[in-house]
């Protein structure tokens, strides 16, 4: 399902991709894409692209750990994050096999506590996703133990039906801009 649907979404979103690319490049110096090192299936590292929403000199830590994260946003960054359009380039990662459409969100390489807890519960064996059960149940504001609990619940219930439910809930949350902190 990932290859077919991910490829179709990548093609259909082409014009939007170009528009976002241009908006990032025209509103702030630096590349349009930001590549972050993420933890994938079996704890292997991979590069995950997003449209750049933060200034080039932003420290490489999770946004919620920054002091005054808003001061690092680019002029278009808040809009891209609120609409989740910054995630659009991850369709390339789905096509490459680094990501699934649905699965636990990949941890940053330096989120040792999240990686350790996921490994303890076996969640590391899943291909990470663009969206997941934890994201539709809280997105940015979840504490790590609760996030891993949702990841574990997803692992136990994983099916096409559950994935489709998560995709629909994700679209609803994005349209309502629920759970976006920065």
Predicted regions and their residues:
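A hydrophobic, helix-centered structural microdomain
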Residues: 1-56, 93, 160, 165-182
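Short, glycine-rich, amphipathic interfacial segments at transmembrane boundaries or analogous
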Residues: 32-72, 130-149
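Short acidic-aromatic low-complexity motifs
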Residues: 81-91
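Short, well-ordered beta-strand elements within core beta-sheets of diverse protein domains
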Residues: 76-83, 152-156
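Conserved catalytic core of Hanks-type protein kinase domains
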Residues: 25-26, 82, 94, 138
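Glycosyltransferase donor-binding loop in the core domain
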Residues: 11, 80-83, 125
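Hydrophobic structural segments characteristic of membrane proteins
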Residues: 89-182
């Amino acid at each position: 399902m990932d290859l077919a649907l991910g490829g179709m979404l990548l093609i259909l979103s082409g014009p939007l991709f170009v528009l976002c690319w241009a908006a990032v490049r025209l509103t702030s110096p630096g590349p349009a894409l930001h590549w972050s090192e993420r933890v994938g299936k079996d704890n292997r590292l991979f590069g995950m692209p997003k449209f750049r929403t933060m200034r080039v000199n932003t420290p490489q830590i999770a946004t919620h750990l920054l002091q005054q994260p808003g001061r690092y946003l680019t002029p278009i960054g808040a809009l891209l994050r609120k609409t989740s359009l910054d995630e659009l380039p991850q369709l390339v990662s789905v096509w490459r096999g680094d990501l699934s459409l649905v699965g636990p969100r990949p941890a940053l390489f330096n989120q040792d506590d999240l990686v350790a807890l996921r490994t303890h519960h076996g969640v590391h064996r899943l291909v990470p996703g663009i969206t997941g059960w934890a994201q539709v149940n809280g997105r940015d504001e979840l504490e790590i133990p609760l996030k891993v609990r949702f990841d574990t619940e997803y692992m136990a219930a994983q099916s096409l039906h559950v994935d489709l439910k998560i995709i629909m809930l994700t679209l609803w949350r994005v349209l309502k801009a629920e759970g976006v902190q920065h």
